[in-house]
Amino acid sequence: VASHVKQKTDHPLWFMWACLLHDIGKPLVTTSDGHAPLHNEAGVQVFQDVPLITSKKERQYISTMIMYHMHLMNMSRHQARDISYLRLLKKIDGKVSMNDLIYISCCDKLGRGKVAQEQYDAFWTFIQDKQQRLGCQAIPALIDGHDLIEYGFHNHQCFKDMLEEAYDLQL
């Protein structure tokens, strides 16, 4: 399936690597009943040891695709709120386009074999609604580290947590 859509992605070769490796964590976490909880997180860890790909940007793209390849389908299935979609946009910002994430999600779903047309249609309706109303890019943060320094904050170790909380409240 992936080979049919790769040319529609931002980085066709990187996309194909991501499709090949997206389930690489499954052997580590698959249970006796066949479920593979958190295989995406395990996959990112396994990918860290893959020496074939050396470009930092390419590794970041593939890691992000491995980590989030199931998120859109899960969001659609559970009718996730807008804030979940906006948080996902922030997590992939500058690493992977929403377009590429949609393609890997669809390839993953269609690659399993039988997919109910209603389920696939519901996914597209969900995604199109989110994109039309909320966009495909992360909302820029209203404050950054420079602002915190300007306002007199000095504990730089807390900046990341403070900025993440501020961004979440902004959404």
Q: Model-found features: residue ranges?
A:
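Divalent metal-dependent catalytic cores for phosphoryl transfer on phosphate-bearing substrates
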Residues: 2-117
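Charged substrate- and nucleic-acid-binding regions of tRNA-handling and nucleotidyl-transfer enzymes
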Residues: 109-171
